[in-house]
């Protein structure tokens, strides 16, 4: 059978099917049990930063509804749940340990294991303690060392039960969107600080990998959001150069230090005016390139790039707020993102499933030291509503997910070493500067009652997981609703 649909079933032994969330987007309980402000709590309080003035204060109340949410994961048949721990909950001021915060994650891990679900832990999904931001944030090299203290706390509490440890999720966002464009927390628009943040997050990653490896961790990795960079006109030198710049800032500035132990030469030259060379110290790149056991790939869409003015495809860096963002493309602020006329999600992102196949195959072709890959986020935002019969029809999201799963299968057929797929997201949640206006979940959340209702996409994903197992057993319920509690 050729892999034109997800019914293709030659998945590698042990292939993991999961779903993902992030602490700041789902937990709520913003100041409960010792937690203090993260940069996102502080950012959301500033008028105009978040669409509709939304905040993550309550989110989807996962902090209080966690056991029911884990039961829902079990009902869906997930192999794994990818979640993040909140630095602002574990070390509220960035420097002292909060045992109540760690206790929550210990209970979560125990619930997952009891349900037969593999915990997949991310240490940093953008919620830096506000106190550390006030000390300079990621532009301050000391923050990398404070991250190791935090990682050690989490490992001490959970290392006996958690196998998979991801240091960072999408450092592109927490550095370039947070410190250059300002559309993400902490909302700074300082290119030199953004470049320093990139390097210091790399350094924090490497320091944590070495520290946790020494303590016995066996599966250590990082998750990067990666995209194909496609020149609008491959014969046009202006478009070729724009595509090179985009690839440098979106992909290679993150991949190369980790996998090759060096920044790309063109990136060093491009960012020399913004201080990249100034923040690199002797020995840093040896630390940063510490071997990893897996690489998480987050991918939602790829991008056509031009060096000519073109507003047909958006600006490539806006968020949901009315705040005027700067460009995250430091030194390449002129690049544009022409539309290809493809269908678009509610995020205004083009839908091109084959882009994921191309990306996964390209990774293996370009990086000799590439570890096994996991697609750690892939999903789509669309408008959806609970119907009178209790259903949540979301055919566009369902098709998006199944088409991208098929693309992963084609990449595996082509030789890509991909070992898992996590749909984003398990639950509708706080979508950063878009607030609650964009829904990615395969489970609908009524934000007024916190009632969970599995969408058609969740049911389809559950059926796919069951069909993909060598010896499928049991049936997927026709409809599943988790009540408000």
Predicted region positions:
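Active-site mouth loops of central-metabolism enzymes
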Residues: 51-65, 138-141
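Catalytic domains of carbohydrate-active enzymes, especially glycoside hydrolases
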Residues: 65-86, 290, 294
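A common structural microfeature
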Residues: 14-16, 60-63, 80
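Active-site region of glycoside hydrolase catalytic domains
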Residues: 2-50, 74, 92-95, 102-485
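Internal amphipathic alpha-helical repeat/solenoid segments
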Residues: 62-71, 92, 101
């Amino acid at each position: 059978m050729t892999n034109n649909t997800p019914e293709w079933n030659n998945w590698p032994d042990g292939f993991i099917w999961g779903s993902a969330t992030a602490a700041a987007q789902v937990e709520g309980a913003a100041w409960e049990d010792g937690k203090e402000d993260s940069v996102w709590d502080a950012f959301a309080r500033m008028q105009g930063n978040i669409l509709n003035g939304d905040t993550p204060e309550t989110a989807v109340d996962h902090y209080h509804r966690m056991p029911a949410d884990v039961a829902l994961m079990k009902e869906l048949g997930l192999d794994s749940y990818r979640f993040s721990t909140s630095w602002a909950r574990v070390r509220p001021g960035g420097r002292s340990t909060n045992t109540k915060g760690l206790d929550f994650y210990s209970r979560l891990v125990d619930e997952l294991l009891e349900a037969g679900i593999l915990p997949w832990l991310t240490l940093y999904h953008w919620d830096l303690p506000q106190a550390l931001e006030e000390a300079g944030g990621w532009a301050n090299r000391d923050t990398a060392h404070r991250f190791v203290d935090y990682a050690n706390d989490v490992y001490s509490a959970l290392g006996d039960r958690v196998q998979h440890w991801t240091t960072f999720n999408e450092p592109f966002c927490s550095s370039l969107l947070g410190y250059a464009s300002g559309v993400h927390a902490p909302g700074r628009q300082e290119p030199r600080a953004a470049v320093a943040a990139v390097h210091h997050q790399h350094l924090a990653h490497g320091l944590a990998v070495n520290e946790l490896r020494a303590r016995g961790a066996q599966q250590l990795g990082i998750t990067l959001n990666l995209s194909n960079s496609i020149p609008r006109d491959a014969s046009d030198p202006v478009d070729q150069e724009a595509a090179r710049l985009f690839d440098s800032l979106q992909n290679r500035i993150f991949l190369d230090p980790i996998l090759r132990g060096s920044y790309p030469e063109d990136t060093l030259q491009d960012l020399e005016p913004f201080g990249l060379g100034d923040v690199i110290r002797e020995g840093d790149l040896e630390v940063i390139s510490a071997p990893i056991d897996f690489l998480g790939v987050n991918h939602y869409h790829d991008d056509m790039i031009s060096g000519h003015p073109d507003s047909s495809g958006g600006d490539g860096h806006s968020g949901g707020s009315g705040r005027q963002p700067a460009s995250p493309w430091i030194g390449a602020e002129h690049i544009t993102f022409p539309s290809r006329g493809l269908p678009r999600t509610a995020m205004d992102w083009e839908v091109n499933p084959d882009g994921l196949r191309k990306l996964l195959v390209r990774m293996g072709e370009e990086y000799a030291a590439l570890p096994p890959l996991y697609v750690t986020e892939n999903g789509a935002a669309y408008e959806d509503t609970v119907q009178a019969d209790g259903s949540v029809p979301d055919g566009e999201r369902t098709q998006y997910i199944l088409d991208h799963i098929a693309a992963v299968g084609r990449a595996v057929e082509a030789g890509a070493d991909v070992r898992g797929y996590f749909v984003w997201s398990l639950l509708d949640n706080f979508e950063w500067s878009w607030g609650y206006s964009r829904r990615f979940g395969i489970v609908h959340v009524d934000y007024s009652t916190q009632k969970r209702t599995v969408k058609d996409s969740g049911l389809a994903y559950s059926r796919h997981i069951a069909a993909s197992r060598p010896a499928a057993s049991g049936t997927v319920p026709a409809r599943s609703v988790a009540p408000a509690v």
